[in-house]
């Protein structure tokens, strides 16, 4: 599922030439004052399906309140102008704004740049999900992989007073993406046999989190778990699920994944 209208899948069939088939919906599905469009990005094709869905709804149900539920915002990594690259996040957000949804619901954007670029934005509170993980894992410390995550989550979530905080610093080869160096900043002296929860917004293959967890366990931590709001399918290609550095991954259902693992616990939104 990549696009649903009030729970009904839209545009999932194909003509022989691979063009999408967009069937009209039963009028009863949208015979109300509110329509919810759920959008889960997998490929750029899904963006086309979203465009057709909104244009169709505008034609057939003009005047109805239409809300976009887009928990993960595509292209959120490209949140600044970088020489040699197109500012793709801005152009994607321009497209969403042009569709003129009454409200756009998102979860844990990669940066405040995304929030500034999308009109009629509603942020789902990440605090609720972090609280659930804390209740399950009872961590002694929360670890943020970099200073950006430290700043973002220090403002977005409130931790119990008994949970300490430290963070990481990494040097990355911008051409290859490979992590060249990783270090722990303000690592607590009493971390031996303690539980640590890593918190961030997005996981792909998880190289940063493996580097973090390996160092944290090497200095004596007993258990290291990870909370990410968005977990891409590529986690199955990385080392997180194949090694013992990270004991459990907590995430949302914001992105479709082709597989499953006993080490992944999913919150449904």
Feature-to-residue mapping (PLM):
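PRPP-associated nucleotide enzymes
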Residues: 1-269
